[in-house]
Amino acid sequence: MFCYHESIEKKDLGKGVLFQYLGKGQNMNVFHWNMAAGSVVALHRHPEEQFGYVIKGGFEIELEGKKYTLKEGDAYFIPPDALHSFVAIGETEAIDVFAPIKKEIPGEK
C-alpha cells in the first residue's frame, strides 16, 4: 500500500489540530498530525501503544503526571492506558503509530 500526501484527506479537529489517517497494516495504524502553536490534545488514554516522531516543532507532553519537552527529531513512546496530553510548541508536525490498530479514529464516532 502507498499513501500519496496530496490525496489523503485532512481532518480538522478544531482548535488548531489537523490530522491525516495514513492507513493501517495487520497490527498497526498511522496518523500524520499538524498542530498550531499552543494547540492542545487534552489528557486522555487509550488501550493501544503509541509511538511518535516529531518532524517539526515540538511538544510538551504530560505522561502519567510528569512533563517532558520534545523537539524536532525526538521520538516518544506512550504505553497502553497511560494518561497523557500534548501541547504544541510552535507549529508542530508529527507521525504517530498505534498498535494494535486504534479503532477510535479522532473526529469519527
Label every PLM stretch briefly.
Residues 1-27, 107-108:
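A short, N-terminal "cap"/entry segment at the start of jelly-roll beta-barrel domains
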Residues 31-45:
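Conserved short histidine dyad/triad with adjacent acidic residue
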Residues 49, 53-59, 64:
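Glycine- and acidic-residue-biased ligand/ion/polar-headgroup-sensing regions
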Residues 55-56, 71, 90:
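A cytosolic small-molecule/anion-sensing beta-strand core signal
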Residues 58-60, 67, 83, 93:
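Structural motif
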Residues 65-80:
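Short acidic-glycine-tyrosine-enriched beta hairpin
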Residues 80-104:
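Ligand-binding loop in jelly-roll beta-barrel domains
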